[in-house]
A protein has these predicted regions:
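Catalytic and substrate-binding regions of extracellular carbohydrate-active enzymes
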Residues: 1-131, 135, 142
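Polysaccharide-binding surfaces and accessory modules of carbohydrate-active proteins
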Residues: 104-190
């Protein structure tokens, strides 16, 4: 989670910040999760002590189309400089599942098993948003948040494959005490269904 740095009265907040896709989670059928302040999901397990931390939550009613919507996250601190997380996200139901992952980076450092095609005009300039080339960045009224994703590049491969993306972290808010070469690497394994 990247926190909440945006103004709660802006279009960005209502069209992006409140959306499921903004929060490193799984979007089902291109729709936001249902949100009710009175709903309590089921925390299965939590252990925040020691070098290995674990959280397991079940939230099957977040989407009407799902019977399973469960996330288990393990964080492991190897030493002062290295840590890693393992994210098991299980979803059953719905027709499409989109795992959203982003970081404090404005470019991708390197990838494995991905061949991106830039969504661009004839001059090679980025156009549109994740909705498509004809829907501009920041277009309001699209509740899934896709119009708030720009500089779109897609891998059109249809086969399941393991992929990896390495983000070089950028200190957008000047929070680091010293300049560091920080990276966040995400490795996705293909389906285990």
């Amino acid at each position: 989670e990247l926190g909440y740095p945006i103004d709660t009265t802006s279009d960005n907040y209502y069209n992006w910040g409140q959306g499921t896709i903004a929060h490193n989670t799984v979007l089902v059928n291109d729709r936001r999760q249902t949100y009710e302040k009175t709903r309590v999901d089921a925390p299965i397990h939590y252990d925040g002590d020691g070098l290995v931390k674990l959280m397991d939550v079940d939230a099957p009613t977040r989407y009407g189309a799902t019977s399973i919507y469960r996330r288990s996250v393990v964080m492991v601190n190897v030493d002062d400089d290295v840590s890693y997380g393992v994210d098991f996200f299980r979803v059953k139901g719905g027709n499409e599942h989109l795992y959203s992952f982003h970081s404090l980076a404005d470019e991708i450092f390197e990838t494995e098993n991905l061949e991106f095609t830039k969504q661009a005009n004839a001059n090679g300039e980025y156009i549109g948003s994740y909705v498509g080339p004809n829907v501009n960045y920041g277009t309001t009224g699209i509740s899934n948040g896709f119009s708030w994703l720009k500089n779109v590049e897609r891998d059109r491969a249809v086969e399941e494959k393991n992929i990896a993306v390495d983000f070089q972290i950028k200190d957008f808010r000047n929070q680091f005490r010293e300049t560091r070469n920080l990276h966040l690497r995400m490795t996705m394994l293909n389906s285990f269904t």
